[in-house]
């Protein structure tokens, strides 16, 4: 039972969200880290991400039951109770905001609450109504990175918006590759994902390339705002070009295997970016 509720918290996604907040915190701390604030920020971000993930499972349980990829999740499979899952999700989000407000700062707590609201009540319903849902979803998806920056600085600065831009841009090829891989499943669940609405893949491939290409200059913004140094700048450009190359390969051969390669590159991109920030920070 406990394992099923852990699955509801989407630990893989929650870990990436928390890592993005860590990236924002590093960019907001060019001269020194406040260990205590960092700890509470990571905990609050993880709790919020887990709560939002759980509530998302509750909202989409009927549609998950229609899809092969998600039919065996705890709620559609009957291994977890929807009412209990709803309570757990709300509790986790409230705990996150309740921790961040007094122990980090009010602005970061507000961003966490805004992330939950936008993800659950804007992005989630849009997934079934418009092909632009992925683009809209980049906003709540990138807010935790901005929250990491505000946790370190207490304000919305150029470095924070640079971090937000990186995460927002990165999400498009990441989620479009996933949507392409499971487009038949999404069609069964009646989701209006771009590869479902436009099955030829032209727009999907073009957007993946476009946003991956945009990510290369956007990723350098922390250097231009003096929130990161030259080591990060030198490393993040080839990292972005490699990611871009996988999308170009997908454009030439729109198969599930090539889409999976884009997805893998996107999953490795964020840890790679954080590693570069750490090396840059320590050196």
Swiss-Prot record:
Gene Ontology CC terms, in alphabetical order: plasma membrane
Predominant subcellular localization, coarse grouping: membrane
UniProt keyword annotation of Membrane present: yes
GO biological process: heme A biosynthetic process; heme O biosynthetic process
Membrane topology: Multi-pass membrane protein
Coiled-coil parts of chain: none
Pathway: Porphyrin-containing compound metabolism; heme O biosynthesis; heme O from protoheme: step 1/1
Substrates-to-products reaction catalysed: heme b + (2E,6E)-farnesyl diphosphate + H2O = Fe(II)-heme o + diphosphate
Top EC class of this enzyme: transferase
Family, per entry: Belongs to the UbiA prenyltransferase family. Protoheme IX farnesyltransferase subfamily.
Something else known: Carbon 2 of the heme B porphyrin ring is defined according to the Fischer nomenclature.
Described function: Converts heme B (protoheme IX) to heme O by substitution of the vinyl group on carbon 2 of heme B porphyrin ring with a hydroxyethyl farnesyl side group.
Name assigned to this protein: Protoheme IX farnesyltransferase
Originating organism: Salinibacter ruber (strain DSM 13855 / M31)
């Amino acid at each position: 039972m406990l394992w099923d509720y852990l699955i509801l918290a989407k630990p893989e996604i929650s870990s990436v969200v928390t890592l993005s907040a860590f990236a924002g915190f590093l960019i907001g701390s060019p001269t020194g880290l406040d260990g205590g604030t960092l700890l509470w920020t990571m905990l609050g971000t993880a709790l919020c991400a887990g709560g939002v993930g759980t509530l998302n499972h509750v909202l989409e349980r009927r549609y998950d039951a229609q899809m092969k990829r998600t039919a065996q999740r705890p709620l559609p499979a009957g291994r977890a109770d929807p009412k209990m899952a709803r309570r757990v999700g709300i509790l986790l989000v409230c705990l996150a905001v309740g921790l961040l407000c007094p122990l980090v700062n009010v602005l970061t707590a507000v961003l966490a609450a805004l992330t939950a609201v936008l993800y659950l009540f804007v992005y989630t319903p849009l997934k079934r109504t418009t092909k632009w849902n992925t683009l809209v979803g980049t906003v709540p998806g990138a807010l935790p990175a901005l929250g990491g920056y505000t946790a370190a600085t207490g304000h919305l600065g150029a470095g924070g918006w640079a971090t937000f831009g990186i995460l927002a841009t990165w999400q498009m090829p990441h989620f479009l590759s996933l949507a392409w891989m499971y487009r038949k499943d999404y069609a069964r669940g009646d989701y209006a994902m771009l590869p479902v609405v436009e099955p030829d893949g032209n727009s999907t491939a073009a957007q993946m390339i476009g946003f991956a290409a945009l990510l290369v200059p956007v990723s350098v913004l922390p250097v231009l705002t003096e929130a990161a140094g030259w080591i990060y700048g030198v490393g993040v450009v080839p990292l972005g070009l490699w990611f871009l190359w996988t999308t170009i390969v997908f454009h030439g051969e729109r198969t599930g295997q090539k889409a999976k390669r884009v997805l893998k590159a996107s999953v490795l991109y964020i840890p790679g970016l954080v590693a570069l920030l750490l090396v840059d920070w320590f050196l």
